[in-house]
From Swiss-Prot:
Name under which the protein is recorded: Lactate dehydrogenase (NAD(+),ferredoxin) subunit LctC
Temperature dependence (free text): Optimum temperature is between 20 and 30 degrees Celsius.
Family of the protein in this entry: Belongs to the ETF alpha-subunit/FixB family.
Effect of pH on activity: Optimum pH is 7.0.
Organism, scientific name: Acetobacterium woodii (strain ATCC 29683 / DSM 1030 / JCM 2381 / KCTC 1655 / WB1)
InterPro entries: DHS-like_NAD/FAD-binding_dom (IPR029035), ETF_a/b_N (IPR014730), ETF_a/FixB (IPR001308), ETF_alpha_N (IPR033947), ETF_asu_C (IPR014731), Rossmann-like_a/b/a_fold (IPR014729)
Named cofactor requirement(s): FAD; [4Fe-4S] cluster
Molecular function in Gene Ontology: 4 iron, 4 sulfur cluster binding; electron transfer activity; flavin adenine dinucleotide binding; metal ion binding; oxidoreductase activity
Regulation: Activity is stimulated by divalent cations. Highest stimulation is observed with Ca(2+).
Gene3D superfamilies: 3.30.70.20, HUPs, TPP-binding domain
């Protein structure tokens, strides 16, 4: 593993102060004239790039070159519950087809479970070249040991170059366990995936609190793993004439044995599913107090929308955590989302920027939300929202209200600002 070596003879307090000012993680300590790198270091390498010369050296393990030609194909893990395929699987198949086209690789789907062979035909209709099926009675319920063993067995036999996994409860448990077995890279919650011609998968996601978009590449190991949330990508159209085939796989029974026995499955009650909402009204710091949410809920009810929030709404205790949009919440892709008093930081934008139509209301004309909004209204939401409510209800229901004038819209090729 890479590490930072300190050239002790070139260290003094002035050097420490310079490094401490550069390091965003406060990962340097200086005691008894001794400089040390603490466990807080994230290997961002900022100190190596901008720190004093002759003080720090990057020590890296010797890299063993891997023959990437031995690994072929982009595999999508099929996430399902009792044969009901999670829609994130189809979205990943669409992205896998795009990536595979760059390097001329086939697209595979890995399906494991009990009595699920017939589901392979459904996967072929989305343009998969081959579906590998492990249909075993021991795989009826998701139990981590046998499922991880099956994925490992598949990798050993097929040698895929990349494996795309949905960021579901199952995917987040399975992918890291198997990636650790191969000591290979895994990037969680990717928002963008790109492919290099040398088959390196470029995995892009916000990092360091959303301040940068990190491009992560697994250069020296295979297979490459990543997880992606539901609604980040778009599912492809079904093909009229599927061309792929199905291969039934076998595995040693000993690998399907687990110390865990499922005694009973208790289905969770269906709760809030923000990711399926077609119209959303999202509120941010611009909402001053909880009482003001009454007006917002009234507006949302008028247009048939679900009310959601950014992280401050959760921290204030105003919303259920399942209603948060963003990196630490849900990813959504509604037909319409109206952002009220939301600045549009990367943490929030990453969870909704693929929405079909985005309307933003914010008092700051330079707010980042306007960079992704299709229509923006610059102004106080406490003035704009009542006017919108009046327009929706109609003048006959608001006889005491003065005539409302809405500023003329200035239209740009793709976006509109009011």
């Amino acid at each position: 593993m890479a590490g930072i070596k300190i050239i002790k003879e070139n260290v003094d307090r002035e050097t420490f102060e310079a490094l401490a000012e550069i390091c965003p993680f406060d990962a340097f300590s200086y005691e008894n004239d001794k400089l040390e790198v603490t466990a807080a270091c994230k290997m961002c390498k900022m100190c190596l790039k901008k720190g004093p010369e002759g003080v720090l050296i990057l020590e890296e393990d010797e890299k063993v070159a891997i023959d990437k030609s031995l690994y072929r194909g982009i595999t999508v893990y099929v996430d399902h519950i009792e044969g009901q395929i999670h829609p994130v699987t189809f979205e990943l198949i669409g992205k896998a087809r795009e990536l595979a086209a760059v390097i001329g690789h086939p697209v595979y789907a890995l399906l494991m479970g009990t009595n699920i062979t017939e589901k392979a035909d459904e996967l072929l209709k989305y343009g998969v070249d081959k579906v590998f099926v492990y249909d075993k009675p021991e795989l009826k319920h998701f139990v981590i040991e046998p499922y991880a063993n099956v994925l490992e067995d598949f990798i050993e036999k097929v040698k895929p170059s990349s494996i795309l996994v949905g960021a579901t409860n199952v995917g987040r448990s399975l992918a890291p366990r198997v990636a650790a077995r191969y000591r290979t890279g895994l990037t969680a919650d990717c928002t963008i995936l790109e492919m290099k011609e040398n088959t390196d998968l470029v995995q892009i996601r916000p990092a360091f609190g959303g301040n940068i978009m990190a491009q992560i590449v697994t250069e020296n190991t295979r297979p490459q793993f990543c997880t992606v949330r539901y609604k980040v990508f778009t599912a492809p159209e079904r093909v009229n004439e599927p061309w792929g085939d199905v291969e039934m796989m076998d595995i040693e029974k000993a690998k399907l044995v687990s110390a865990i026995e499922v005694m009973e499955v208790i289905k969770k009650e269906k709760g809030i599913d923000l990711s399926e909402a077609e119209t959303i009204v999202a509120v941010g710091r611009g909402v001053k107090c909880e009482k003001d949410l009454d007006m917002i809920h009234e507006f949302a009810e008028k247009i048939g929308a679900t009310v959601a929030c950014t992280r401050p709404g959760i921290e204030a205790g105003w919303f259920d955590a399942r209603l948060q949009i963003g990196l630490s919440g849900r990813t959504v892709k509604p037909k319409l989302i109206i952002a009220l008093g939301i600045s549009g930081a990367v943490q929030f934008a990453a969870g909704m920027q693929n929405s079909e139509y985005i309307i933003a209301i914010n008092s700051d004309p330079k707010a980042p939300i306007f960079n992704i909004a299709h229509c923006g209204m610059v102004g106080d939401l406490y003035e704009i929202l009542p006017e919108l409510l009046t327009m929706i209800e109609g003048p006959e229901n608001n006889k005491d209200t003065e005539t409302i004038s809405i500023p003329e819209a200035i239209e740009t090729p793709e976006r509109m600002v009011v």
